[in-house]
UniProtKB/Swiss-Prot annotation:
Membrane topology: Multi-pass membrane protein
Assembly and oligomerization: Part of a tripartite efflux system composed of MdtA, MdtB and MdtC. MdtC forms a heteromultimer with MdtB.
InterPro entries reported for this sequence: AcrB_DN_DC_subdom, Acrflvin-R, Multidrug-R_MdtC
The encoding gene: mdtC
Protein name as it appears in the record: Multidrug resistance protein MdtC
Organism: Proteus mirabilis (strain HI4320)
Family, similarity comment: Belongs to the resistance-nodulation-cell division (RND) (TC 2.A.6) family. MdtC subfamily.
Organism placement in taxonomy: Bacteria, Pseudomonadati, Pseudomonadota, Gammaproteobacteria, Enterobacterales
Length: 1027
């Protein structure tokens, strides 16, 4: 009591202390970064390696496997996957969440250095790594277009001038340049001319290589001067290469131009990018794990004017896609919901108190508590994001509860005739322990959340600490600032016995009278009330088990990612045409703003698209509805399939799949995997719970298989190396020389002219020189036949792997899809040699489902322990916790009513309800215990008196919490799909709990009091018997 008196008697100190809390919070608010969600990025490192012309199988065995063996020794790797395609290998390492990304990068570099001696000698460069997740959507896409410059020149500008500059910006991990390739001198050989001039392909390669060299020539000097020697040993343009002498036919000179067409072109002619219906080069920008997306994008935008100055006037640099507008809009909506919640809560207080002065007290306490929280958020390294702002919105109802309980009790004493200061001191002393119990037990709910690890723990941690801080500050304000303001602001109020019987006060009075009558009736039918209570326990179990579940609500970010998968034997030109048609059809949709995409590179049959939708306020359909419409519209494109998925802020794993969820098949025997994967994929494709079912297993690519007759080769004086060199020279786009320029390096690329590679007859024109200098046709020692070959080879760990990706159609949830997959695997009788595991988000969802009930139980046990310590009782905490089953039923029924699946956000709502609804029981039970102890009342008299006297503050606190959550439940606009499940859960739980616990709590209080008395009587009788 002395502590409370200190704050009441020193209003200046109390006011300034509260002002200091507010100022620190305001400063923290201005310094807080902004983000869509708490930082939950897994440390992911992606390694790239290339060997131009190598088949996927060659890349897998000679590049991927040695690297995997070295990288697999690194500590802290959760998952290692690799994908090898034509001429390239990509290895993705997903580390434990607690692994520092920079430490991981150092370990990766050391492993790459150690494996260098195991890699093929023909690799043009060492493997390189990026600290980015290939499965993440890019944060920004820039495009380069020009009416005067070709794609090779644009690509050169993008990679040489822009990509390096952007990569240096803080927060940027990787800048991928797509839609083309670097300029190059291309040598297109004519097999007929080579035959007629008796020139081999290797003669041409050696001649070009020896004619373009760059080596130091030294210098000459005397006593006075020094001269560096510089020669014209380097050739830079196609016109410089054409006169090269490649062979002598007796006295006749054969120049390169006699046997080939030499042009200034690009390294890889089989790559194309498009944006806005015109050719474009794309700069796809990804952020580093842990980097703030909005700050990173802001830094990039700040650099754009300088970047444009580096480009010729004829080149246009545009922002094709920016991830941040919808993030900013979503946060603005949450802030609006927070403001509405504060206003509604204060309105509730005013309706009950009917006094401007009295309403001013919680109207001050709420913002002080909320604003002060920002300082703690800043010190903890948090951000202003959807979850932290939702925590503050929900906290509005919590923080006002404490002020309401104190204010209402002080007001009651003033109405009974006490002076304001006396009423303030007496009132806060009476309910101080109640407020402390309410706050500490509410904080206890979040202790298990704070101890959680993994992605879910990271998501919950920021929410829990933000809410806990707001509750802690609210507790302090309610026991200091609130009684002080009551003592000084309420002094003009005089007792008015009937003042509360007008308007809203009259309604509450009638409700209280009605409650008194119905409570007496309930006390006469205790068994029925207990039966209802037990029924709610069973209903909770049924509703939870049968509830449709998902990992995280599907967000409408206004961004879609598109993946085109075509026939495995498709040509680049056909693939480019299909991409163009797909993009034109998508761009014509009424809700689509822009489409950017590219195809080519190592995967000729694949294309990628980045689609921006119109702002949510300008379209009538959600992102998923747009996807469904486009899926139907584009389903009949022959030879190609389009897969679309919405960009999400929460995505686990490192796989770049064609759909949102993945199911991976693993086998030690590749033949077993090839046998079962098509059967499983077909079965899953027929399930109604899945859509867009596809696999990364591509083993039906067209191949021309050559078989060497080694005996004949030996007789003819030809070795396998010579034969392979012939094929590489002819068909491998072989990079045979390097052109060194001031800002970059370019290649000289040699292959047979495209007109001679249209069919298998090209092999008949191939000749190799034997050891005697004789020209031997390829057909003399080799035979060939068409076959199938893999377009990609995939590993997980060191096992062969194939990932089946899928989306979930409307009307079903992720839990439905997972159950259907597991059921199908059992029905198919898949052997133990083929193992199926969920990956990425689906895997995290499975782990979360297993821990949800444990988490809820841990929260309940923690609250029980805290309440037991506070009340020094085993029984009273059970009475207080008896309010939870009805809240659970209300929450789960509300989710069903609004057709909302049970997700992590709904789980947060359930955890909050554990803290909210027990407040009413605490208010009731605490008063009854005091009345029994000090008023010498029976248990029934005490609980009836407590129920009636505390009816008004119970209704006030419930309505405050309900109206605090109502803006979330009724929210619309950007990010509403995140806010609604939380609001629905809280509002539904509060309504059902309020309806039932006003009756069940008194009955259960009396039940446990009877148990306590019988137990005490039994102990007493035992003592007497022993005496």
């Amino acid at each position: 009591m002395k502590l409370f008196a200190l704050f009441i008697q020193r209003p200046v100190a109390t006011t300034l202390l509260s002002l200091a809390i507010s100022l620190c919070g305001a400063l923290g608010f201005m310094l807080l970064p902004v983000a869509p969600l708490p930082q939950v990025d897994y440390p992911v490192i992606n390694i790239y390696a290339s060997l131009p012309g190598a088949s996927p199988e060659t890349m897998a065995s000679s590049v991927a496997t040695p690297l995997e063996r070295s990288l697999g020794r690194i500590a802290g790797i959760d998952e290692m996957t690799s994908s090898s395609a034509l001429g390239s290998t990509s290895i993705t390492l997903v580390f434990d969440l607690n692994k520092d990304i920079n430490t991981a990068a150092r370990d990766v570099q050391a492993a790459l250095n150690a494996s260098q001696s195991l890699l093929p000698s023909g690799m043009p460069s060492r493997p390189r790594y990026y600290k980015s997740n290939p499965s993440d959507a890019p944060i920004m896409i820039l495009t380069l277009t020009s009416e005067t410059q070709n794609t090779g020149e644009l690509y050169d500008l993008a990679s040489t001038r822009l990509a390096q500059k952007i990569s240096q910006i803080e927060g940027v991990s990787e800048v991928s340049v797509g839609g083309g390739s670097l300029p190059a001198v291309r040598v297109a050989l004519n097999p007929d001319a080579l035959f007629n001039q008796n020139v081999s392909l290797d003669d041409v390669r050696k001649a070009i290589s020896q004619s373009n060299v760059r080596r130091p020539q030294g210098f000459i000097h005397n006593d006075e001067n020094r001269w560096q020697i510089q020669t014209n040993d380097e050739l830079s343009k196609a016109q410089d290469y054409r006169p090269i002498i490649v062979h002598y036919n007796q006295d006749a000179i054969v120049r390169l131009s006699d046997v080939a067409q030499v042009t200034d072109s690009v390294q890889n002619a089989r790559a194309a990018g498009m944006s806005g219906g015109e050719p474009a080069i794309l700069l796809v920008i990804r952020r580093e794990a842990g980097a703030n997306i909005i700050e990173t994008v802001n830094r990039i935008r700040d650099e754009l004017p300088e970047l444009r100055e580096l480009l010729p006037a004829s080149v246009n640099l545009k922002v094709a896609q920016d991830r941040t507008p919808t993030i900013r809009a979503s946060l603005a909506e949450v802030e609006r919901a927070l403001a509405i919640a504060v206003a509604l809560v204060i309105l509730v207080v005013f309706l009950f108190l009917r006094s401007g002065r009295a309403t001013l007290i919680p109207a001050v306490a709420v913002p002080v508590s909320l604003i002060g929280t920002f300082s703690a958020m800043y010190l903890c390294g948090f951000s202003l994001n959807n979850l932290s702002l939702m925590a503050l919105t929900v906290a509005t109802g919590f923080v006002v509860d404490d002020a309401i309980v104190v204010l209402e009790n002080i007001s009651r004493h003033i109405e009974n005739g006490l002076k304001p200061k006396q009423a303030a001191l007496k009132g806060v002393s009476e309910v101080g322990f109640t407020v402390l119990s309410m706050s500490i037990s509410l904080v206890a709910v979040f202790i298990p959340l704070l101890l959680m690890d993994g992605l879910v723990g990271r998501l919950f941690k920021e929410f829990a600490i933000t809410l806990t801080t707001a509750i802690g500050i609210s507790l302090f304000v309610s026991l200091t600032l609130t009684p002080m303001m009551c003592a000084h602001l309420l002094k003009g109020i005089k007792p008015k016995a009937q003042s509360h019987l007008r308007g809203f006060g009259k309604l509450i009075f009638r409700l209280q009278q009605g409650y008194s009558v119905t409570l007496q009736a309930a006390l006469r039918h205790k068994r029925w009330i207990m039966a209802i209570f037990i029924t709610t326990l069973g209903l909770n179990a049924y509703l939870y088990i049968s509830a449709p579940k998902t990992f995280f609500p599907d967000q409408d970010t206004g961004r879609l990612m598109g993946f085109v998968r075509a026939d495995q034997s498709i040509s680049f030109q056909s693939m480019k045409e299909k991409m163009t048609r797909f993009m034109q059809e998508i761009n014509a949709d009424k809700d689509v703003d822009s489409v950017t995409g590219f195809t080519g590179g190592g995967r000729i049959n694949s294309g990628f698209m980045f689609i921006s939708l119109n702002p949510l306020s300008e379209r009538t359909d959600s992102a998923n509805q747009v996807i469904n419409r486009l899926r139907i519209k584009l389903a009949n494109e022959p030879g190609a399939t389009l897969f679309l998925m919405p960009v999400q802020d929460v995505r686990a794993g490192g796989r770049q799949a064609n759909a949102s969820y993945q199911f991976t098949l693993l086998a030690d025997d590749l033949s077993e995997l090839r046998k079962w994967e098509p059967l499983i994929r077909k079965a899953l494709g027929e399930l109604p719970e899945l859509v867009d079912v596809n696999s990364d297993k591509e083993d039906k690519g067209a191949e021309m298989a050559l078989t060497y007759d080694r005996d004949t080769m030996s007789q003819l004086g030809i070795n396998v190396s010579d034969a392979n060199n012939l094929l590489n020279n002819a068909f491998g786009q072989r990079q045979i020389s390097t052109i060194y320029a001031p800002l970059n390096q370019y290649k000289v690329v040699m292959e047979v002219s495209e007109q001679y590679t249209q069919d298998v007859s090209a092999l008949d024109k191939m000749y190799v020189m034997n050891t005697q200098g004789e020209r031997i046709p390829l057909s003399a020692f080799a035979s060939w036949y068409p076959a199938n070959a893999p377009l990609s080879v995939n590993h997980q760990g060191l096992s062969a792997a194939s990932t089946i990706a899928f989306n979930v159609p409307e009307g079903y949830t992720l839990s439905d899809a997972i159950n259907a997959i597991e059921r199908t695997m059992t029905e198919l009788g898949v052997p133990n040699t083929v193992r199926g595991t969920f990956a990425g988000t689906a895997q995290i969802f499975q782990e979360t489902i297993k821990s949800q009930l444990i988490l809820i139980l841990a929260a309940i046990v923690t609250v029980y322990i805290v309440l037991g310590v506070l009340y020094e009782s085993y029984i009273h905490p059970l009475t207080i916790l008896s309010t939870l089953p009805s809240a659970g039923v209300g929450a789960l029924l509300a989710l069903r009513l609004f057709d909302t699946p049970f997700s992590l956000i709904a789980l947060i709502g359930i955890m909050l309800l554990i803290g909210i609804v027990k407040k009413n029981a605490i208010i009731m039970v605490d008063f009854a215990i005091t009345a029994q102890r000090e008023g010498k009342l029976s248990a029934q008299e005490a609980i009836i008196q407590a129920s009636l006297l505390r009816f008004r503050p119970i209704i006030m606190t419930t309505l405050a919490a309900l109206f605090g959550a109502l803006p979330l439940m009724l929210s619309s606009g950007d990010g509403a799909e995140l806010r609604q499940p939380l609001g629905i859960t809280i509002v539904g739980g509060l309504l059902m709990s309020q309806l039932l616990t006003l009756y069940t709590t008194p009955i259960i209080y009396l039940f446990f009091d009877g148990v306590r008395q019988r137990w005490q009587q039994r102990r007493h009788n035992k003592k007497e018997a022993n005496a």
